[in-house]
Each structure stands twice: as C-alpha cells, then as structure tokens.
C-alpha cells in the first residue's frame, strides 16, 4: 500500500519514513455512512396529486439532499462523473498512481500543491470529512474541522490516499460511485445528484439527459462559479460541461450523435428548469404552514427519534424521515378558507386574530389547524397580516404568552349552571357590580388562591338590564349575569 505512492511522495520532498508514519496512524478504512437528508411531512388528501391518500406538504432540512441507489441514477450521470473526475476509476485501487506522479511533478515545479490527482474515492474521503465537520455542534469546531479537511497540505493528500485504498477494499466500485454522487455539493445548499437534478432541471436523477448530467457534474469542482442558480454562472458551466462531454466521447461512453446533440445545447434559461426551494414551514403548502410549525416544535416529544430530547433533535436534523401526519387537507382547506373569509388577516382597524382546531373524537388526532394570519417566521418578518405566533398552541409549541380568555369562559359557566340542575329560563341579575375576587379559587395552581381584591365588573355596552333570563344573558353575552 505504501509503496504505491512512495515515488510521488519522494518527488514532493517528503521522506518515505514520514509517509509510513502517516499511513500507520490512520484506520484501514472510513465508513461511508448515511448523509443528512430532507425530512418530508405528508397530510391526508383525496384530491388530485395524492399518492395512496397522502400529499407532501413540507420539506425541512439542513442540507437539501435525497440519497438514491445506483439504479436510480441516470447512466449519463454515472459516466459523466467518471469522465469528468476520474477516467481510470474502474481500473485503479483508490489511488491513480499515474495521475499522482504527474501532479507531483507539477507541484514540484510550482513549489506547492496545485491540486489534481484526486480520484473519486479520494474525493469521497474528503467529502466525508467535510460532512463530519459541518455536523459538529459549535461554529468554532466546525471551522477548525473544515479547515483541516480542506487544507492544501501533503499530509491531507496522504491521508486521503490511505483511506481511499481502504475504501476500495471495503466497498464495491458501484457503492463508491453512488456514495460520491449522493454526497457531492452542487451549490445553492444542494447536495447529491437527486436534489441537484430536481433543483436545476425539475427531474429525478434517473431521468437526466446527457446534457443535463454533464452540466451537473461540471458544478462539483467549483460550485460557487458553476452552479445553475444564477445566469452569471452559465458560461463557466457550459465550458466545463463541454470538456466532460469530449471526455465521454473519447472514452466511448456516448455516440457521436449523442455528443453533438448535447454539445449543441446551450446552457441558458431555456435549458435550466429550476424548481423553487421550499425549505421549512415558510415554504410549506399554504394550508399546512401552521400545522408544520406545530409538528417541528413537537420533535422533542417524538420517541421514535431517540431516547432523549437531544438525541431526537439531532436525528431530526440529520433528516431522511417521511412523516405521515394526522392533518386532513380535505377538511383543512375549507377550514382555513372560511377563517380567511371571516377574519381577514389584513384587518388594520383592530388587532384581530382568529384560530381554529378540529380534533377527531375518541382519538384526539388533530385534523385541522388554521389561523387567520399568514405564517412568516423570517427574521425580517412579512409585515402586517403575518405572524410566527401560533394561536392554536401553547407557549411551548409556538404560541405567545397568551391572551385573555374573555367571554369564552361563559360557556363553561353556563355548563356548570346546567349541570347543577338549573334552567335557561331562570332569571338572574344582569347588572354590573363590584365583586371580591378572593371568592374565586384557582384550582389549577398549587394553593388555589385566593387572588386579588374587589374589582368593578362592567357590561360591555354599559347597560343595566336588571333581572334577565339565562338564555337572553347568554345570547347577549351579559357580563353581570355570569358574574
């Protein structure tokens, strides 16, 4: 293993003994593992576009990635990766000695590392270390680990060589190529060939054309200047894409006609077919944003994610979950539309808010969750008519510190009245009066009161109706009667 790279090392000025020391200090191989992916929330729906009675309503992720198996990747993309990044991928054992020696000579002339010679296996090793760095808990740790994983030093290259050789012993070529295409960064917070195909061309990875596949592989070396998120990058992307196409033709991966058709395809707005990024509840289906927010704030309670709240949050952040929720869009859509119709979110005459939740009797399953405000949790906010405060939930799950219950409590007073055997036709005083609040005990807190002193309760309209029957008092929401 060491002998394979010793000639190249000698050309760089590093001794063979130091090479052996670096090699011996490393494990035999590195685990590929599973990379962070998107979480997807689904709601019940019987309308057009549903799959088995459900429809996706939100995607939530730290990294926009969806891992796919080898057979779900276009052959054009597989071939483009090999042609563009590692022509001898299927014949070397992790390190392309021919490229290493050529690059080493270039480095000697340049007086430092100028790049090159990294096989797909070596690039995969590097990306695994980069990914691990990005998942560290603090910014300081992430920065230090990222710099170590990307440092332009010979030691790093040697580590990548050693681990790439071990990688080739543990995994098949198909597994390594698939892992590379799933971990690669394609710019614009897009990771992996599937997310890249969807982001830039609105297709799945298995359906990529030759021109599309080559354009995506053209991104990986310099994502910032070649990704397809902006027309400013189109020219650089096309130039690199054409180099990859020429390599594919030379290697016999495509026919002359296939090559010419792809080569003649301009990288422009007609070629790029981007799909909108919809990360988080702000990008969720407009009828599911508040429920999405409620679900995300409940992650710490999902026992299937782990034994502790910390473990649950970490697993959720790594993603890859398909969460089928209780939200029923067949009921949610009309519920939300009705709330918007009768409690306008743009109302400026008063601080008007409205919320509505429907639960299934017997199970407590939340079927609808609506609010008149438009959900917006961005730092700058969405202006009047928007909010990030979920009126349907408790403080712990997205609400504010609360609002006065007001006349909603009259319902419970009425129920207690009826439960005591009294009738709706009985007459009581509806006049305003001063009441000693110490008479009322708080049975929901330790100690139970008493709280407060005399308070002058008034009727909203200032009326003094005298004796009034309970039915009329309820219809008129007369405060004096309920006190």
Task: State the predicted function of each range.
Residues 216, 413-417, 482:
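Buried hydrophobic packing segments
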